[in-house]
């Protein structure tokens, strides 16, 4: 059975609001900015089935299927994934937003893999994406934050082991 592994690019919007402003005011002013981010990414990103956009209080999450970036049990980026990363880097580089790269996986790890634990491979994958964005695409390092969670903190409530489930 094949599990999905999602890479999350979370663009955190920082708003300058006074301490006297209510939470409702912040969320109301926040929503148009997230809508705009989503429009920007959708206009530049290639149209693919494995890309899901989700608006959350902390920003826009762009979830991308693991097969876009990695082979099973491996943390090296596939050459075919570089176009998607180049596009994301191009946009992130021009925005004021930070980019958090969250890696989650419950995919079976082959015995001959360099990684034995889910957290090890997910951390290495997030770091490799960040390294590519910073070293190859020149995104400022202070804007990119890689995080590996292994099997912990799955993104979707419908986590399952079926091919259509999300981790």
Give residue ranges: language-model regions.
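N-terminal targeting leaders that direct proteins to extracytoplasmic destinations
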Residues: 1-58
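A broad detector of the eukaryotic-type serine/threonine protein kinase catalytic domain
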Residues: 25, 67-69
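Periplasmic OmpA-like peptidoglycan-binding domain that tethers envelope proteins to the cell wall
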Residues: 31, 56, 72-79, 92-94, ...
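Periplasmic peptidoglycan-binding/anchoring modules of Gram-negative envelope and division proteins
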Residues: 33-47, 52, 73-103
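Short, aliphatic-rich beta-strand segments
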Residues: 60-66
């Amino acid at each position: 059975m094949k599990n999905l592994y999602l890479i999350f690019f979370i663009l955190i919007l920082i708003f300058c609001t006074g301490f006297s402003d209510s939470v409702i005011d912040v969320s109301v002013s926040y929503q148009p900015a997230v809508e705009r981010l989503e429009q920007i990414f959708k206009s530049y990103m290639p149209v693919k089935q494995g890309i899901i956009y989700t608006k959350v209080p902390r920003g826009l999450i762009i979830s991308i299927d693991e097969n876009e970036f990695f082979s099973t049990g491996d943390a090296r980026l596939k050459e075919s994934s570089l176009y998607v990363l180049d596009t994301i880097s191009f946009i992130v580089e021009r925005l004021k937003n930070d980019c958090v790269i969250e890696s989650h996986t419950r995919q079976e790890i082959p015995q001959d893999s360099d990684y034995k634990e889910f957290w090890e491979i997910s951390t290495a994958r997030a770091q490799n994406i960040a390294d590519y964005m910073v070293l190859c695409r020149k995104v400022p390092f202070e804007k990119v934050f890689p995080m590996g969670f292994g099997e912990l903190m799955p993104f979707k409530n419908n986590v399952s082991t079926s091919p259509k489930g999300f981790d």
